């Protein structure tokens, strides 16, 4: 009986671990270091460790490099080994590859949108969704979680999709073509009409 006890304990721990894994998370955070690959992370670790140890070559620890799990993914897109923010963010947001410059659209037909994980959580699970960026809020990386465009340069249309997304919160740099072609309401007005409280800084 005593010999079997470790197996029983191990099975119980495994079951408890599985149950913890299957629990619905209260919050989900996705952080994207745009253009940050293994080389950039390793350089930052060496810089941090060396500066903290008076110039002695030392590998430092970053807040996320001590996480218990790590993974890696391919970064090429459907047509290029050197992709851009639009296609790579599409892969992160939807699990699908597309062409460089395209946001959440099928690369073969250009008329089939890909649903993002943020949209799925918002519609199917009633999660509240926020998108926060240090770049323009209609830049390809943040836009990949709420927009669907055949070119990342459709900034005004991306801004309209932001307003139509129904997501609860957005924060980032100004819309890049806030007035569009000048024939319709600007992106601030479109967002306000959709119920958003639009707040800008002095810099706009």
Regions found by a protein language model. Give the residues of each.
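Sec-dependent, cleavable N-terminal signal peptides
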Residues: 1-5
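N-terminal catalytic scaffold of extracellular/periplasmic and nuclease hydrolases
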Residues: 6-181, 185-204
């Amino acid at each position: 009986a005593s010999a079997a006890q470790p197996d029983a304990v191990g099975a119980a721990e495994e079951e408890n671990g599985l149950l913890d894994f299957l629990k619905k998370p209260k919050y989900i955070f996705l952080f994207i270091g745009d253009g940050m690959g293994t080389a950039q992370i390793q350089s930052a670790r060496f810089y941090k460790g060396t500066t903290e140890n008076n110039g002695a070559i030392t590998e430092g620890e970053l807040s996320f490099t001590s996480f218990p799990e790590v993974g890696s993914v391919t970064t090429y897109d459907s047509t290029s080994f050197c992709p851009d923010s639009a296609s790579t963010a599409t892969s992160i947001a939807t699990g699908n590859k597309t062409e460089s410059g395209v946001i959440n659209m099928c690369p073969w037909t250009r008329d089939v949108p890909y649903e993002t994980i943020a949209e799925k959580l918002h519609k199917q699970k009633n999660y509240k969704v926020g998108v926060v960026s240090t770049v323009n809020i209609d830049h390809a990386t943040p836009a990949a979680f709420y927009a669907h465009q055949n070119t990342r340069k459709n900034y005004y249309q991306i801004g309209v999709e932001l307003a139509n997304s129904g997501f609860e919160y957005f924060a980032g740099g100004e819309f890049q073509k806030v007035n569009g072609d000048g024939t319709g309401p600007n992106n601030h007005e479109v967002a306000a009409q959709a119920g958003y409280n639009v707040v800008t800084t002095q810099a706009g």
